[in-house]
Amino acid sequence: MNTEIKYLELLSKTFKNIAETSTEIINLQAIMNLPKGTEHFMTDIHGEYEAFNHVLRNGSGTIRNKIEEAYGNKLTENEKKELASIIYYPKEKVELMQNKDNFNIDRWMITIIYRLIEVCKVVCSKYTRSKVRKAMTKDFEYILQELLYEKKELANKKEYFDSIVDTIISIDRGKEFIIAICNLIQRLNIDHLHIVGDIYDRGPFPHLIMDTLAEYSNLDIQWGNHDILWIGAALGNKACIANVIRICCRYNNNDILEEAYGINLLPFATFAMKYYGDDPCKRFRAKEGVDSDLIAQMHKAMSIIQFKVEGLYSERNPELEMSSRESLKHINYEKGTINLNGVEYPLNDTNFPTVNPENPLELLEEEAELLDKLQASFLGSEKLQKHMQLLFAKGGMYLKYNSNLLFHACIPMEPNGEFSELFVEDGYYKGKALMDKIDNIVRQAYYDRKNVEVNKKHRDFIWYLWAGRLSPLFGKDVMKTFERYFIDDKTTHKEIKNPYHKLINDEKVCDKIFEEFGLNPRTSHIINGHIPVKVKEGESPVKANGKLLIIDGGFSRAYQSTTGIAGYTLTYNSYGMKLASHLKFISKEAAIKDGTDMISSHIIVETKSKRMKVKDTDIGKSIQTQINDLKKLLKAYRIGLIKSN
């Protein structure tokens, strides 16, 4: 009781009397009855900034829905298309129209402003005026409020309304106002953004994606396997650093390292030329961009360094059971073959100038110095560390949100449907306990990052999360990087998916996972990414009778020939859940000039029989707790237990 009174006394410092407390209760109770805000789910972006940015701007088709709601048949299809294009790219679209010959730009702007106001009214209708005001550009806050909340239809308001718009145009602020109202529409169209892993990978602009995400307040991120790789690199894990650089070389993306994050690759390039200058490096030509001998040499040089470091990490962490990644130890350097599980395979490349056959995992002094310098660069990159800070502040292994369970790849399972056990640090963990333990270890590694000698085990474990058999982020038995480079026999390349990926077609398995995480099996969904959905082969993103959704459909251009589409995204609003299937993104220029969009179709996953309100959400539960506390404070004021100020 004393604790409760102390809490109420603390609360009374904010709500100082009966009037203030009552007002807050009324306000919160009103919010509870507003429609639930729209959640937007995206995954496996893989550095494809332009496509990601476009999907954010169009809200996976929800902007078009708002235009339809505002105008129905009052506008032609081309007019709706133009309006959508303006909302997505207001600055660029206005500038395009301004450069048209013999075009009345003022009249066009007036028409567009009126249309945007109607769309904005629809978007704002599910929010309080306070929330809408906070989302407004300060320069136009008062004008926007007047235009949004005044009724133009009233005779005594029409002239007032029209004069505001006319003045905006006459003082040459039309472009800025259109940008402001379009930004407001975009900002309020999506109430909460979920990124279900893999911001990083082969695409060229993950840093721009991170910059964009930093602008979102209502955001969460579930770490993907490529994200954890960059986290490990940023924390000084040398195996992760080697993998990151190798992948950047593979896809000709060294600009990410050098230009975006300020990591100096010149000493590494010099090293690669010294040892591989006369090597054609046929298996190491860049997959994208201009073919370059130097990039191929760097690619091979870092691959060999990676195989050495991974072997050393495996040796010093035998409990991780990663000995299969000690590949260089299994090579017969005289015969040019490798022994895998008792079978001898010829190598397609036997030039290993930096490998000592007597001690193949030993780093050359130059390699060790190079890794030390690269480690210092990753640890010292201000922008990289800032981006990793965002991944820790907003991210984690999984999230429970509004009866949905979000995680990137899998919960490791056995073929019989039981959760797999993994020995981590001090014991065996499985299911939810494993996810929580991993989250804790990664955070401990982050807090110890400034002293690379502290808790090496924590930092080493991050490499296991990238490539380990029971890693919830990897979801396969083994990563066959060496085999794919050096062995032509493709049977050695096969990576077997964790049983989870087959078992999730069974509703009972999904129910088991819901129960493990304390969720109601009747109302919950699992939302995953990681495994591209092969739509052109008839595969569906909806599994287990709608209980599980896989929304990786191929943002990455490299996967689009396999999937047949350019990705899935998911929206969850007050009416239910809807999957959007995306066409390949042509270009930002085409979207601006021709109104080209990415949405090809929608799949209704779930329709609510009764429209969901804020009170039906996790935020609603939190607000209800606040209301209950305020009612206690109100009672305390009325009976004199706490003095009213």
Curated annotation (Swiss-Prot):
The keyword Hydrolase applies. Transmembrane segments: none annotated. Pfam families: FBPase_2. It is an enzyme of class 3 (hydrolase). GO terms for molecular function: fructose 1,6-bisphosphate 1-phosphatase activity. It catalyses: beta-D-fructose 1,6-bisphosphate + H2O = beta-D-fructose 6-phosphate + phosphate. This is Fructose-1,6-bisphosphatase class 3. Its EC number is 3.1.3.11. The keyword Manganese applies. Keywords: Carbohydrate metabolism, Hydrolase, Manganese. Pathway: Carbohydrate biosynthesis; gluconeogenesis. InterPro entries: FBPtase_class3, Metallo-depent_PP-like. Belongs to the FBPase class 3 family.
